[in-house]
Amino acid sequence: MLRTCLAIGIAISQLAVPASQAEPRRLNNVATQLVGVGAVAGNAETVDFANPRDGWVFIRAGKPAGAEPRAVIDAAESALVWRAHPRNGALEAMVKLAAGPHQLRLEGARRLTVDVRAIPEIAYCYYPTKPHIASYGPYDWAYMEKYVLPDVNTIVTRSEVDPDQFAQWVREGRQWLSNASLPGLSSEMPPSPDEVYAYWAENPVVTKPGFGGLIVDEFIGASEGHYAAWAEAWGRLHDTPGFGGKTFYAWCGNMWDEPHSLEFAKKLSEKDDLFVWEQYLREGSDEQDARERIDRCKSQFAKWKQELPGVEQKMVLCLGYLSAPPESLNLNPSADYHVYLDMQFHALTTAPEFDGLYGVMEYMADYADEESLRYAQKLFRHYCIEGNTARFNNDPYLLPHLKNADFADGFDHWRAEPAAEGSVETRNMKGFSWLQGRYPKTKQGDTFCWMKRAGEKPNRVLQSLQQLTPGRTYSVKAISADPARLDAQKATPLNIEVAGAEMLPQFGFSFAYPSCYSHESGPYSSQNPAWFTFHRAVFRASAPAAELIINDNGDPGAETAFNFVEVQPFVEP
């Protein structure tokens, strides 16, 4: 049984109630308060609690005025390693414990508040990694310490981790998972069990200490022969000494939809291995469409529970926050992607279909907009740790600030100011949005504003932004390209200005990127990618309305095509 732990922090009110007297209280589908918030009466305190299932426990002890208190769970040889939350200094810890009674012993904790909760597995995927949009900055350990580590207990890695960082995370009681692919998945002929086993057996999860499990990507549609080979290799892996006591995670689709995949799923369940169910939900055209996509997720999960009773206790539901080029579920610039993420988290943690869910994950940091990555951590905290049932984000699903973001209706709601006759038009190109990175494939975004620079004077398009909240920060995003030289590896200059608002240039950038290797259209492929430029400008509203001005900024004769003009509330670091 793992008895180590990590700590993070959040402000807690001081309550004059002995911590050990509180009764467990279910907060939502994934969080249960085992010991209520209360002040420690003496210098030493013993807190008894019962973990309702094998899994993660969150311990919070407030912000100390002096030295950190010493905390030990059960008969552990070492004390918990606290982590002070970067925003408020409160001490928190997470530890993976078996179901049943436990005891927390605190020394030097007088007047500190104590709060103990059962929480889900909260996973971050992947570290180390770097974003495809380099302007976001590195997702390095310093970034993780500030924005990610306080709110997760599991990190998925697919590459070498700095030894000191690896050891620190293990000391804190949290968990590393090592990623591996699934041999034979892309081949028509099944692999041999020996081939599959040999590949998994050389993974660091077997050859190096400290990992909690192996997460294999991915169990989807395949033949009976494939599943027979994978099942045999999986069984042999569990018999391997280096894998003893570790967990096999199956990244998967609907494993109940074929007899052979369902049979393998039953074996995984009997062994208490875990499923990581992929639910990468694209934005809907409106809120009703978005809710229907979440409802389909609910109905599919009901099928899981029908075929594998109790599977919710072995399920990590993997959402997708692919929200930036070159592959993005944020494909509708008229919708607020952060509102949609909040809708998904709210459903997982409050809808009865997901009651008892073991864990939650977002896939994956490489493709995540940096702002959305930070925002998702706030959702993990709000729902999975604090156990809230009220929505975190009450903004409307459809963004009210700008209309006709993809120029699908020509210049409706826009005012075009061409520098010369015929130098500004709306055009379309089949596959344009797919090459941009919108996923899954859609015709939305195949229309765009086209400009051709004429002499020294720029072309301009303008739109009045509406329903802004004075003092609130917003981003303007756009994606541009040179339609005459789409394969040219260069940035397309585009100037974005918001008149009547305070521009915040420290958050703005333009970054050229190639189309995703799997997004092929016409002559463009992984070997001959199309090139686009992702633009972001950020402003603080001074009034309920402002004027958005976009102009081309290239050399005379240069062509620029752009769309995906999204104006959305911005989450500042």
At which residue positions do the language-model features occur?
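Short beta-strand-plus-loop segments that form exposed binding edges in beta-rich domains
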Residues: 105-110, 549-558
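Extra-cytoplasmic beta-strand recognition segments
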Residues: 55-63, 407, 459-492, 535-537, ...
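Beta-strand acidic-aromatic groove motif in beta-rich domains, primarily in extracellular
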Residues: 66-71, 416-418, 459-461, 484-500
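Short beta-strands within extracellular/lumenal beta-sheet-rich domains
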Residues: 38-50, 88-94, 111, 451-472, ...
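Extracellular glycan-recognition surfaces and repeat-rich motifs
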Residues: 406-448
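Short carbohydrate-recognition loop motifs
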Residues: 29-38, 431-457
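Glycan-processing catalytic domains of CAZymes
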Residues: 98-109, 114-395
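Extracellular carbohydrate recognition and processing domains
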Residues: 36-41, 76-96, 501-545, 555
